[in-house]
A protein has these predicted regions:
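Structural signature of multi-pass alpha-helical membrane transport proteins
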Residues: 1-91, 150, 154-260, 320, ...
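The feature identifies polytopic integral membrane transport proteins across all domains of life
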Residues: 66-73, 94-108, 125-135, 232-235, ...
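Membrane-interface helix-loop-helix junctions at boundaries between adjacent transmembrane segments
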Residues: 88-144, 149, 153-165
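Extracellular/periplasmic helix-loop-helix junctions in multi-pass membrane proteins
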Residues: 30, 221-228, 281-299
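Membrane-embedded alpha-helical segments of transport systems
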Residues: 75-83, 108-113, 130-150, 170-174, ...
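Helix-loop junctions at the membrane interface of multi-pass solute transporters
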Residues: 61, 114-126, 224, 251-255, ...
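Transmembrane alpha-helical segments of integral membrane proteins
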Residues: 53-54, 277-284
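Helix-helix packing/entry segments at the starts of transmembrane helices
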Residues: 195-201, 257-274, 280-281
Length: 330
């Protein structure tokens, strides 16, 4: 648990460092063009590795639990977007219109894979089902997120072409992902052996995209349009979203008769939003416009969900350990 937290903390510090560097030394002009091409290559590599790491056998092992998966997908792609729209009268005064669009983008994203599985495992939930749900959510997000973004931002007066977005996502994200899945039969063992180094590549790709995005945002005046009050309000907004979804997933899991292991999986898989997918996807979806404000809510939500879910997972694990000790004593 301490090692897991250390990794997340180091990556969070790196994210903050990259935002600071982009604020002080943003890339612009020819440098921005160079970083743009480099970012596109990094995004392709990131999704190629996602495809190469994803085990089809693990997905098949947990695929039969369709009621659980349906509930997780509903929380990810229905509950979150509905909350984003329903809370608009509360959220806009807290964060302003620009950051609110970023909150809506956050609500449209798929679940994260790695942390959902890690926390489910730590809390002693249904790990095969968590792997299947999180992986399928990530894949569905390639198609559903652009459409949800079109509907959500259209409802807020910022429309776009959903078909064009899906085409861009397909070419820049899905094609490398499928190529990675195909290549898995030859490089799967190598990927597994070098998982630690490939994690660095994953995170490095995300940091590069964040630097490029925030450089563009700083050049176009992000910190002049986003006030300290709105940043403080963003903490409140992300906390409200996470609290409502955590409460909702727990309540629905109980009401629908799932056992404890499945309820743990629903809680952790249904409440996550993927930074690894959301940052590069924003670079594709919002090309030509400053995306710093679009990914800022996601970056903050990412850290809050890790801290809160780490505490929850530890509590579930402690309760399970106490139950096992009591059973052994009797």
């Amino acid at each position: 648990m301490k090692y897991l937290r250390m990794l997340f903390d180091n990556f969070t510090l790196a994210l903050l460092g990259v935002v600071f560097i982009a604020t002080v030394l943003p890339c612009s002009g020819d440098g921005a063009v160079y970083f743009g091409w480099l970012t596109n290559l990094a995004i392709g590599l990131l999704f190629f590795l996602h495809g190469a790491k994803l085990s089809r056998e693990a997905i098949i092992a947990g695929a039969g639990h369709w009621r659980l998966h349906l509930l997780v997908f509903s929380c990810t792609f229905v509950l979150f977007p509905l909350l984003g729209l329903a809370f608009k009268p509360l959220f806009v005064p807290l964060v302003g219109n620009e950051l609110y669009l970023g909150v809506l983008y956050l609500c449209a994203l798929p679940a994260t894979v790695q942390s959902a599985i890690a926390f489910t495992s730590l809390a002693r939930g249904n790990v095969p089902a968590a792997i299947c749900s999180a992986a399928a959510s990530s894949l569905l997000g390639i198609f559903l997120t652009p459409l949800l973004v079109m509907m959500l931002l259209g409802a807020s007066g910022d429309t776009g072409s959903g078909l064009d977005a899906v085409l861009k996502i397909t070419l820049q994200l899905l094609v490398p992902f499928v190529a990675g899945q195909i290549a898995r039969r030859w490089i799967g063992a190598w990927v597994k052996r070098n998982a630690r180094w490939l994690k660095v590549v994953d995170q490095g790709s995300i940091l590069l995209v964040v630097y490029t995005a925030f450089s563009e945002a700083v050049v176009t005046g992000l910190w002049h349009t986003v006030s300290p009050q709105h940043l403080a309000g963003l903490f409140v907004v992300c906390g409200i979203l996470l609290a409502v979804v955590l409460f909702g997933t727990r309540l629905l899991g109980k009401a629908l008769g799932f056992d404890l292991e499945d309820r743990i999986t629903i809680l952790f898989a249904g409440s996550k939003k993927s930074l690894a997918t959301g940052v590069p996807m924003a670079q594709v979806l919002f090309v030509g416009s400053g995306i710093g404000a679009m990914i800022l809510p996601l970056m903050l939500f990412h850290q809050i969900q890790l801290m809160v879910c780490a505490v929850l997972a530890q509590r579930y694990a402690s309760r399970e350990q106490v139950a096992q000790e009591a059973s052994a004593a009797s």
